[in-house]
Amino acid sequence: MIYEVLKKHKHVMEYDEEADIIKKSDIVDLLKKTWEITPSKNNLMPWQVFVIGPDNQNYKNIVYNICSKNEDIANSVNEYKDNDYIKGRNPAYANIKSCQYLLIMTQRLSGPLNAYQQKQWDNGVFYDSYTEEGLADSENTICIECGIFGANFSALAIEKEIDTSYTLCFTGKIKYWKELPFINRPVTLLMTIGHGKKYRKNIIFNDPKPNFERIVKLI
């Protein structure tokens, strides 16, 4: 049952760096299956997924620094900020440094169009993400689709006893990602992959989500 699978998800604070490396072929298989089952508005998929593997620790370190610096800036406006906090160091992002694989999802200008889409375009149908201006206006759609892709990948990974975690604590603006030469569009979502060592559920004992009635309103 998919419900039982999804219940097993746990946010990883830190991955086991001594665990056996997950085969690249297994990750590719999961990614292909995720791509296959993930829907997209008009089948345009105006986003892309960059896969950082075990051999590119330098890229993971760069992403860790981007997230930590963003945290420094975000928390600085809180009047109750932690005075003992060490700038540039955040254990919440240890999963980025210690993961085996890191997924970086970004926007993508749609195209080339398939035969059906081209016919529709020629008949006057406008695809937002097929133009630069329209792509900028498609941010919400792109974020939703990346979230669906991430959730699908996570579910498939759980079936293989592989852990995943999401990170959204960063600025997606390209100027902050210049150290990664392959990033040329705004970043939308980060996902880490590996075998967990420390999990948030085991560290934080009293952090419940808002109750069902607060979130779901039956009209």
Describe the role of every protein-language-model region.
Residues M1-R108, P112, K217-I219:
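N-terminal amphipathic, basic helical "cap/leader" segment at the start of enzyme domains
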